Structure formats: C-alpha cells, structure tokens
C-alpha cells in the first residue's frame, strides 16, 4: 500500500454573512444604549467596506468597540479589518472606513512559506492565488506546521481548511 500524503490549505477569510449579522445586532444595541440616545451613530457595509459614522471621533471609537464585540462573538476575525483614519463627514459627523481583508497577499504568503521552509518540518508548501497548500507524509508534521503558523505575527487571521 502506497503512503498517502496529507494536506491542508492556509486561508484568510471573512464570512460576509456573519459580518452583516454582527452589524444588525450592533445597530440594535446602539438604538437601545442610553449614551447614544438622540445622537447620530450608524454602521453600514458598502462594497465589502465597513463604514462607521458618529457625531465625533470618540463616538466612532465607541461604535467600533460595540461592533468588534459582536464580530468576535460571531467568530469573525477582527484582525482582518483595517480601519483608515477618521475623517469629517457631512453634518459635522465623523466617519471611518474599514477594509475587510480576505485572502493572503503575495508578501504575507512569502513570509508564511519562508517560515514553513525554515522550520525544518518535512512538508511542502505551495502558494495558490490567495491561499497556501501544505502537504506532507505525516499528519503530525501538518499539525506542527499549524502550531508554527499560529505563532506568527501577521496582519491577518489564518484559518486551516481542506484537511485531508
């Protein structure tokens, strides 16, 4: 019987349905919160970008904190959301845009690949568009690679799927 290779994919994804659900729950909480009564506070999703609008920068940060709490409860990695600087909007309000990062860019894919190669674990890794496929003869080696990748300090959250 031939030795079968095991593999898994390293991906970085944001579940848009969960983001939409978290936004709805956060908006409900904003309507009921005493410190937001009568003030402007809104969260929208426009073209895969989060838009947070509030009366001032302080309230924008409060709205983001509420949203982050809801996203964490729904297992959406907040590491994959990169907010820009706050800017002035119409009506004296403040606005911030948040980019939702999905997929592993080439620069970070190379860092991950290099870390796997330098670890000395007997596996092969290939960059495939926005994910990385890791293959090896032993499932134990693959689990060592997963542990190694969890330790890396990257600007995105990594997930592992297609474990075979």
UniProtKB/Swiss-Prot annotation:
Cited Gene3D superfamilies: 3.30.70.860, YajQ-like, domain 2
Q: Which UniProt keywords apply?
A: Nucleotide-binding
Reply yes or no: does the keyword Signal apply. Answer: no
Please give the Pfam families that the UniProt record associates with this protein: DUF520 (PF04461)
Q: Name one GO molecular function term.
A: nucleotide binding
Key word DNA repair present in the record?
A: no
What Gene Ontology cellular component terms go with this record?
A: cytosol
Task: Kindly give the InterPro entries that the UniProt entry links to this protein.
Answer: DUF520, UPF0234-like_C, UPF0234_N, YajQ-like_sf
Q: Which CDD domains match?
A: YajQ_like
| Xref: SUPFAM superfamilies | YajQ-like
What PANTHER family has UniProt attached to this entry?
UPF0234 PROTEIN YAJQ
The Swiss-Prot or TrEMBL record describes its family as follows: Belongs to the YajQ family.
Role noted for this protein: Nucleotide-binding protein.
Give the protein name, as stated in the record.
Nucleotide-binding protein EF_1165
């Amino acid at each position: 019987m031939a030795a079968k290779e095991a593999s898994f994919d390293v991906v970085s994804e944001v579940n848009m349905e969960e983001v939409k659900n978290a936004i709805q729950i956060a908006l409900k909480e904003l309507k009921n919160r005493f410190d937001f009564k009568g003030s402007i506070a809104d969260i929208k999703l426009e073209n895969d970008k989060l838009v947070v609008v509030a009366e001032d920068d302080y309230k924008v940060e409060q709205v983001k904190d509420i949203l982050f709490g809801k996203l964490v409860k729904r297992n959406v990695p907040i590491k994959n959301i990169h907010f820009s600087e706050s800017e002035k909007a119409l009506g004296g309000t403040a606005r911030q845009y948040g980019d939702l990062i999905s997929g592993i860019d080439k620069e970070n894919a190379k860092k991950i690949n290099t870390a796997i190669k330098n670890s000395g674990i007997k596996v092969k890794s290939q960059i495939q568009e926005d994910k990385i496929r890791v293959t090896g003869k032993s499932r134990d080696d693959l689990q060592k690679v997963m542990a190694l990748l969890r330790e890396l300090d990257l600007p995105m959250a990594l997930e592992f799927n297609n474990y075979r």
